[in-house]
């Protein structure tokens, strides 16, 4: 109270009066407004889609929360602003500032992107975290990103995935020949060596393509997401484990020119928001996959099984070629 009285006395003695006091007290509002940053983030996944979609939305909201609303992120789910697989180009061209996706979708731009999402028979989520943070992975990621004007952060991980949904039983490597399968990244490159055709299909269109026969098989994520997408209505055979994706990293990709124009504090806010979601997403998948798998088992409409040993060995052989 004493401090407030002294402030009023000072204003009176200076001859400023009540009007000036009002102006001084309201000064921070226009300063904050002038410093307001509006950002567009484009995502691959649908709004409200468990884990992947909600995770990206959480990152955008957390950036706003950590900045006390000063950074406003307009989050566009897949298809709301650009197509689900067009988010990379939208950010590299500068039309949007951030994307939320998985970097293996960009292997057509450079095969190196696949290493920053999932590698067949590669690292699980915790190993990816260790490599990126302490094993030189972030430096390699930055080097690749520089070629495209990007700076990328870890923003989630779906953990070990399932092997996929098939409309025919797989008993040997020969059973893959001629199949059309939706499988991205390095996993798709590997599986193509088994004689199947790799088809690029956004997540929101998989069910339709699988049920109408446009594709014969698909991998997606794991039981939690696969149940939500109702793949059990479109295919009878559900195989595990997902050797192609032992831990799939989700990315917040930033236009580097835009990011480096921000203050160090704002850059740290964006990185921290991503780091928090990287940990939370993995725990969310671990908490939900088991119960979802049990519900799928209880349906008794599908065959859930491990592939034959020969099939697994073939996976490894082709991975090493």
PLM features per residue range, with description:
Residues 306-308, 313-321:
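Positively charged, low-complexity/disordered segments
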Residues 130-133:
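Short, Φ-rich (hydrophobic/aromatic) sequence segments
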Residues 2-128, 138-139, 143-305, 309-310:
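N-terminal secretory/targeting leader peptides
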